[in-house]
């Protein structure tokens, strides 16, 4: 197989019989070793690439609102304007540049990763405003709704530009996932997605 969307650290540990999760948050050498073990697992299972991403929602509410476990942090235009958008690129770099570098140092010749900046625009939007509240925001505060999409899009462009300029060589395919709905229908109007 070419690619798996994600390797769970617990599964990797069972496959290779060595710890991985504890190393991911350790020193740089630990992170490189963790990625080497992920690579070893991928190779052992017959994969040509390994999955690797560091998500945008880690900059918002760490996916808590996306999963329905946290309230909206954007409700008004003042909330959008007060949000520290201009700090998010630096925060992402501080948190994850070392992880991307460890990946590069761990990849054997001929192997690459698939991924990059995790979470798409819609998933990230829902970490600012959970899905149900998002529907109300769209109807009650359409200007806030539109501006929030735009600001998140700008943040995505900044993050992807940084990643591609600094770490693209580690990737065979750069991609993000965005859960937009189901087979039968999207969760929001397709026209909103196209914007």
Predicted regions and their residues:
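Active-site loop segments of alpha/beta catalytic cores
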Residues: 1-31, 48-52, 65-195
């Amino acid at each position: 197989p070419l690619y798996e969307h994600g390797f769970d650290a617990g599964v990797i540990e069972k496959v290779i019989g060595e710890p991985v999760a504890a190393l991911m948050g350790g020193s740089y050498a630990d992170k490189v070793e963790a990625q080497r073990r992920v690579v070893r697992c991928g190779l052992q299972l017959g994969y040509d690439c390994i999955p690797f991403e560091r998500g945008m929602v880690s900059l918002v509410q760490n996916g808590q609102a996306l999963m329905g476990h946290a309230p909206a942090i954007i409700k008004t235009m003042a909330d959008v304007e007060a949000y520290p958008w201009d700090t998010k690129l630096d925060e992402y770099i501080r948190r994850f540049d070392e992880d991307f570098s460890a990946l590069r140092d761990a990849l054997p010749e001929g192997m690459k990763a698939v991924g990059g900046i995790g979470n798409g625009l819609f998933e990230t939007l829902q970490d600012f405003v959970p899905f149900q509240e998002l529907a109300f925001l769209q109807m009650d505060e359409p200007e806030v709704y539109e501006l929030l999409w735009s600001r998140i899009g700008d943040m995505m462009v900044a993050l992807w530009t940084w990643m591609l300029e600094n770490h693209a060589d580690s990737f065979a395919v750069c991609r993000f996932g965005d859960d937009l709905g189901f087979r039968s229908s999207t969760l929001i109007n397709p026209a909103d997605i196209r914007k």
